[in-house]
A protein has these predicted regions:
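Non-catalytic, mobile gating and regulatory segments of ester bond hydrolases
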Residues: 1-244
Length: 244
């Protein structure tokens, strides 16, 4: 098997593990390798302590990415994963691997432009957190109906909400790396395309925003996911041609 031309590191949303990206591995173009990032205390790292410090978590992610320094790469982040991308860039800047970054795919609204103060979602009651999660139509009944599982999950999601809340105050710098923004048409957090287009303020190479059918977790739908991955492959192909 030929070595892929690109690695795509995928940062999960709050409360999720790297497994949310596993289906992508068989659906993406052959020249792109999907490398899901696992946060400490999540998924296969469930026995490791949760990290509520975005700088520490970003440093760990950056170190993981540097292990693949011989291959050009893409960063994909959904929800809190999008916010962490900018922290990760801070740790990659100045490193040789930073020159290998070809594309950033943002799958989240630019909250720092709409919320000018720290949010306190992590301090909500358990009931309010559950209500918040239900808005996104992705809260499994097997967790909701199992008190032990619910208690365990709420500890993780509260930690991740705290990460997200802190990232709101992050000063996002401008990058020369091309950025494209993806979102779901029915996402309750994104009322219009104009909101997503605000990401263009943070790059010298804005590739636009692309709307997909679906809600906050639009890419969980297999058909939508294929369309999304085809878009990424097409963008990467264009960038490759331009480089050559």
């Amino acid at each position: 098997m030929n070595k892929p031309q690109y690695n795509m590191f995928c940062l999960p949303p709050a409360g999720s593990s790297a497994s949310i990206y596993h289906p992508w591995k068989k659906q993406i173009s052959d020249n792109i390798r999907i490398i899901p990032i696992e946060y400490s205390g999540h998924g296969i790292k469930i026995n490791e302590p949760l990290i509520d410090d975005p700088d520490l978590l970003a440093m760990q992610i950056a170190n993981e990415i540097q292990a693949y320094s011989d291959t050009p790469f893409i960063l994909f982040g959904h929800s809190v994963g999008s916010g962490l991308i900018w922290k990760v860039l801070n740790y990659l800047n100045g490193k040789t691997i930073s020159d290998q970054l070809r594309l950033i795919v943002i799958s989240s609204r630019p909250e720092h432009r709409y919320i000018q103060h720290m949010r306190y979602k992590h301090e909500l009651t358990d009931e309010k957190i559950i209500d918040e999660l239900k808005r996104y139509n992705n809260f499994p009944n097997e967790i909701l109906n199992n008190q032990d599982a619910l208690t365990f999950f709420l500890k993780i999601i509260r930690n991740d909400f705290y990460l997200s809340d802190q990232l709101l105050s992050e000063n996002i710098h401008k990058t020369e790396v091309p950025i494209v923004a993806f979102y779901g048409k029915q996402d309750p957090d994104i009322p219009n395309k104009r909101m997503m287009d605000a990401w263009q303020q943070h790059t010298e190479n804005w590739l636009g925003s692309i709307e997909f059918e679906g809600d906050h977790f639009y890419f969980l739908n297999p058909e939508t996911r294929i369309k999304m991955l085809e878009n990424i492959a097409a963008i990467v192909e264009t960038l490759t041609v331009n480089i050559e």
